[in-house]
């Protein structure tokens, strides 16, 4: 992808460009401001991608192996792992092909590289959209399990969960295809940015409401035990910290990428916005980091899944 559109790393590798360096540097031109550009070494990018691949493959394998994990909640978590897996695999594949082309180990015409790049971009964008969707689906599922506990199993059934999962994947493929085909259209970029904001607001509202309900429940228990202050204060701090970490990681890892898209609409030619565009690979790296962190937030906290994961790692099928 390019600086002012989806970055085309493969196509750009056909041109004479300087290699990336593993340090911060200030970029400047004759008319623009000095910019802080963070260069991401390809080795680091590939390493992070491979770590994410291993983690998410283990999550999917554990859920597939243990029948006790064959429930809507874990299916959503498994689909999130698949989405994060695709994010990592496609980015690793794109970087690997780019390095092979630059090294002359892979001879390809520009048209062939462009077609391959378009396919990879569709996969990257689709996996990003599906990842955001499943983060929202997990939030909705947890909300229903708390506020509609008695009716949860009649509301969130396996057929409904599979229909929701299918709809998310179909919508992700269609939207990513349109985005790559019409990435230079303002309306498409605005839709993608609006989608991110909607997911952020949805998750914030649901998790804040869940935190409020949990604190209310803790106060009720504290009154029964006649030690309201200590229990309420301790739970409030723990709950607030968990919520801050969950939403903070989501915003920090995904926010810069969508800031990049927003600036493409608001100020595509402004020198200061150009400084942001120069760090697009950093924003992709943050998304890869999110794919590494997601299993720790949503999957590895489950004792049942951790136990199954140990069996998978030890190959005790």
Curated annotation (Swiss-Prot):
Chief site of localization: membrane
Superkingdom of source: Eukaryota
Cytoplasmic face of the membrane: 64-72, 141-163, 212-240, 301-317
GO cellular component term of the entry, any: plasma membrane
Lipidation (S-palmitoyl cysteine): 315
Cell location: Cell membrane
Stated name of the protein: Melanocyte-stimulating hormone receptor
Organism from which the protein derives: Vulpes lagopus (Arctic fox)
């Amino acid at each position: 992808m390019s600086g002012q559109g989806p970055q085309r790393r493969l196509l750009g590798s056909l041109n004479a460009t300087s290699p990336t360096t593993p340090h911060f540097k200030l970029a400047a031109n004759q008319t623009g401001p000095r910019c802080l550009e963070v260069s991401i070494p390809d080795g680091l990018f590939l390493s992070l991608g491979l770590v994410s691949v291993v983690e998410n493959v283990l999550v999917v394998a554990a859920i597939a192996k243990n029948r006790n994990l064959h429930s809507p909640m874990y299916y959503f978590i498994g689909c999130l792992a698949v989405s994060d897996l695709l994010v990592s695999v496609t980015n690793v594949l794109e970087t690997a092909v780019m390095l092979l082309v630059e090294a002359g180990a892979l001879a390809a015409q520009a048209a062939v590289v462009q077609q391959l790049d378009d396919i990879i971009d569709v996969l990257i964008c689709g996996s990003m959209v599906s990842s955001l969707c499943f983060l929202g689906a997990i939030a909705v599922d947890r909300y229903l399990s708390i506020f509609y506990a008695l009716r949860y199993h009649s509301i969130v059934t396996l057929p409904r969960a599979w229909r929701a999962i299918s709809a998310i994947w179909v919508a992700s493929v269609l939207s990513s295809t349109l985005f790559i085909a019409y990435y230079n259209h303002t309306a498409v970029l605005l839709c993608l940015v609006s989608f991110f904001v909607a997911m952020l607001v949805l998750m914030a509202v649901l998790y804040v409401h869940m935190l409020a309900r949990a604190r209310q429940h803790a106060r009720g228990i504290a009154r029964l035990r006649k030690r309201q202050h200590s229990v309420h204060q301790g739970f409030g701090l723990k709950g607030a910290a968990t919520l801050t970490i969950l939403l903070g990681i989501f915003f920090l890892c995904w926010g810069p990428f969508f800031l990049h898209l927003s600036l493409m609409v608001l100020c595509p030619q402004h020198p200061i916005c150009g400084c942001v565009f120069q760090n697009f690979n950093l924003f992709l790296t943050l998304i890869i980091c999110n794919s590494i962190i997601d299993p720790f937030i949503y999957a590895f906290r489950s004792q049942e899944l951790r136990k199954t994961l140990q069996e998978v790692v030890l190959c005790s099928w």
